[in-house]
A protein has these predicted regions:
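Sec-dependent bacterial lipoprotein signal peptides
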Residues: 1-15
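Bacterial Sec-dependent N-terminal signal peptides
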Residues: 14-54, 462
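Conserved NTP-binding catalytic cores of kinases and kinase-like/nucleotidyltransferase enzymes
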Residues: 54-156, 160
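Middle-to-C-terminal accessory/interaction subdomains
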Residues: 105, 116, 120, 244-309, ...
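Structural recognition of the beta-strand scaffold that forms the well-ordered cores
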Residues: 124-128, 143-148, 155, 163, ...
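Internal "kinase-insert"/substrate-recognition segments embedded within catalytic cores
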Residues: 133-134, 148, 170-173, 186-298, ...
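Short, well-structured beta-strand/strand-turn elements
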Residues: 168-180, 304
Length: 462
């Protein structure tokens, strides 16, 4: 009788979308409870759901296992552009060994990405379904991303950081689902299916017209995208900013484009001025400081040099007087882990040195391998309370870094061994994924010890 009840409950769980995304095997250190957001955003009750979704006899829980996705464009049209006007109508079919996750429907597909689209043969894609749907157990939406992870020889870099953010309670985390893609009859290899970072009930759940979702991104900013109508230079730190929400269609409804960009610039400028003054008490009134600290510690731990550019750095704020600016979602981490930029067009080299810093040994004074990191990310190190909070938080999460976060990411690799081998045959490179995963683990362990010293010795601030 107990087994009947158990399997009945599991069937219900598998059809519901998962925000917590917990797997079968318990982590060595239990995940900390997800804190109640202080930014006025709404959370899905599933975010703290720790129920298992597979019977104990299954080696890997459903979320780790590899599904098969077949995409056929109408008339066999090639997917050879990332331009929004070049979406190709298509039929999408997903086959999973979790039967309730099988899917077939209509949608559109195009390319996506910047360097990943321009430099590499294995291309990433953006999918837009005709109708919202839950894909492989994730919350229903129309927009999905297929990350090629071609540069990353481990295929785990984004997955690790997504898991870290989720388990630390950074709002609106992305999730990983493995799929092997066949596009117009051509086997394309192993891809990471994940959510599109965007405004939405099951994405970044902020007000569609009065909330803000911004990205600090050189590629989408005024210098490299001068003709775009959704970007600006920030007032204080002169960072390239792209307005992701409200979108263009909503801008026209709400107010003139020029006025809305001006409002975004002013709203962000108010936050910038507080950071410039490194006033901790004032910052707490407008920014979710605990999330900011977690976000920046993750960036340093994985040595994400994109902070310096900056690229793919998101920040959001809901409507309402009590809403706080909140860092995240976390996105795009194959430029971390000591990537060899000397071979950026064709290389897959990582993990050579764990002793470099992006924010720095003394962030306030830019004592770092990247001394041009925008001071927006480092000026708060001038405040003693902020520095004290950073040190305390690292001490708190440090045991989980190697005992919980890495083992969780590793499960995805263990479940995808055969698919990774097929991917390696389809897209051969000068690296063996098993060797690189072992190197990644050693690098992360050494990096954590290095971070212990860095964080402990941060100057105390004023």
């Amino acid at each position: 009788m107990k087994k009947i009840i158990l399997f009945g409950l599991m069937a219900l769980l598998m059809v519901a979308c998962s925000s917590s995304d917990d797997g079968l095997e318990p982590s060595p250190v239990p995940p900390a409870p997800v804190p109640t957001p202080t930014d006025g955003t709404k959370t899905d009750s599933a975010k703290t759901d720790t129920a298992k979704t597979e019977p104990e006899t299954v080696k890997f829980a459903a979320k780790y296992r590899v599904a098969k996705m077949t995409i056929t464009t109408d008339g066999g049209q090639a997917v050879d552009s990332k331009d929004k006007k070049d979406y190709r109508a298509c039929t999408i079919k997903i086959e999973s060994d979790t039967a309730v996750w099988n899917y077939e429907g209509r949608g559109r597909i195009r390319g996506r990405g910047n360097s990943t689209w321009e430099w590499y043969d294995k291309k990433p894609y953006r999918i837009k379904l005709d109708e919202k749907a839950s894909i492989l157990g994730l919350c229903e939406e129309k927009d999905w991303v297929l990350l090629a992870n071609f540069r990353d020889p481990t295929k785990l870099m984004n997955t690790l950081v997504f898991e870290m953010g989720d388990r630390l309670g950074i709002p609106y985390p992305n999730h990983t689902r493995w799929i092997e893609l066949t596009l117009n009859g051509d086997y394309m290899g192993l891809y990471q299916l994940t959510e599109q970072v965007e405004q939405g009930k099951n994405r970044v759940n902020i007000d569609k017209k009065a909330g803000w979702l911004l990205s600090f991104d050189s590629d989408d900013g005024p210098e490299l995208s001068p003709g775009a109508d959704d970007n600006f230079w920030s007032q204080v730190y002169r960072m390239p900013v792209c307005v992701k929400s409200p979108e263009i269609s909503e801008k026209i409804e709400v107010k003139s484009e020029k006025s809305l960009i001006g409002d975004a610039k002013k709203a962000l400028g108010d936050l910038e001025n507080i950071i410039l003054s490194h006033d901790y008490e004032a910052l707490k009134q407008v920014c979710n400081v605990p999330v900011m600290i977690d976000y920046l510690l993750i960036q340093e731990y994985i040595y994400n040099v994109e902070v310096a550019a900056p690229r793919s750095i998101f920040i959001h704020k809901d409507s309402g007087d009590d809403a706080l600016w909140t860092f995240g979602p976390l996105w795009d981490f194959d430029a971390g882990f000591d990537f060899d930029w000397g071979h950026m067009y064709d290389g897959h080299g990582y993990f050579a040195d764990y002793r470099e810093t992006v924010l720095g040994t003394d962030p306030a004074r830019h004592i770092s391998n990247y001394d041009y990191v925008p001071s927006f990310f480092t000026d708060m190190w001038k405040d003693k309370t902020f520095v004290s909070e950073v040190k305390a938080r690292w001490k708190q999460i440090r045991p989980r870094v190697t005992a919980e976060f890495w083992p969780e990411a590793k499960r995805y690799a263990d479940a995808a061994t055969e698919a990774m081998e097929r991917d390696a045959k389809r897209w051969p490179i000068d690296k063996q994924y098993k060797t690189e995963i072992n190197r990644m683990e050693k690098w992360l362990n050494a990096r954590a010890v290095f971070m212990d010293n860095i964080v402990t010795n941060y100057p105390n601030g004023n």
